[in-house]
Amino acid sequence: EFFMRQELIRINSTDGIELPGILYMPDNNTNKIVIHIHGLSGNFYENRFVDTLAKTYTDKGYALITFNNRGKDYITEMLKGDHAIVVGSCYELFEECILDIECIVNWVKDKGFNDITLQGHSYGCNKAIYYYDKKKEDCIKNIVLLAPCDIPKEIEIYTGDEYQNCIESATNLVKNNKEDEL
């Protein structure tokens, strides 16, 4: 069992999607925090290893925040204002991860955290690196990659001999503004 200070949170992404999550705090005040970014179709509450990480980090004097991003589950709904919108890894546009991570970074900075570690798990690793590359914020001191993945290689392995046909088909759909048919 893990006993530590926890707070359920709801933070709106830069474009207004409500992102629920949890903040774990150490016993003593700190300016250090780890922002955990879940992987493809993940969420903040089912990756049990995050409980262990939260205990380890808080014991070392770090806070940890983990949250649902718009890539949560395969297909799901999240709130945007007063209505639900369909999101999930099936609809996620990778570049929009900036909108989710940015609001979390801004929220923790507003709470007094100025020593930030971005931590990604699986597909979340790609998002952490992408965010840092695009924003290059001085408050981000570290990046932790947990089980990083190579999406193109995984697709190639999964599709086998059909890989090139899949790439060409996807490229044509995008060129013809038919991304939803992917």
Question: Which stretches of residues belong to each language-model region?
Answer:
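Gly/Ala-rich beta-loop-alpha elbow adjacent to hydrolase catalytic centers
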Residues: 120-124, 128
